[in-house]
Amino acid sequence: VLIQKKYAALYRENHSFIGWLSIEDTNIDYPVMQTPDDEEYYIHRDFYGAYSSAGTLFADTDSSIQRPSDNILIYGHNMKTGKMFHDLLKYEDEAFYKNHKYIQFDTIYGNGTYEVIAAFRTRIMNEEDQDFRYYQFFNAADASEFNQFVSGCKALTNYSIDTEASYGDSLITLSTCAY
């Protein structure tokens, strides 16, 4: 598979680079990295691997852009400075969502525009918790499992989003921390 011309130079600089994520009218406009052997390598490193408290956006090791996963899970810090994924919190406001229904995630192989289907706050669960774990979904075994994931996300959203997803659609999940 050929790498898009617009990303070839970035990929030559760092083979961990897998794409670019941006959301209009936010500070979210960053490269996305992935390291198969060390999922959190970029949690406190910049694009070049140097220390950075903000880190760089990175995809979960269970996500794949080569054989596209049903869901690509991308992590980023919620920086008080407004950088990285801080502006995801704007989706708590329905008016913001209504004016920003689309997210651009281009991989090194192709461009992708994703329509927002859910926006919510949750927590990382303890082992014994039986609650919905959005961060464990990558590939659905069947339509039922896919629909269960989408329904779980929509149920946590504080306002109504009419957009639906169907089995076979490609999803991205953007995940950050709250403080």
Regions found by a protein language model. Name each.
Residues 1-179:
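Solvent-exposed, non-transmembrane regions of membrane-associated and secreted proteins
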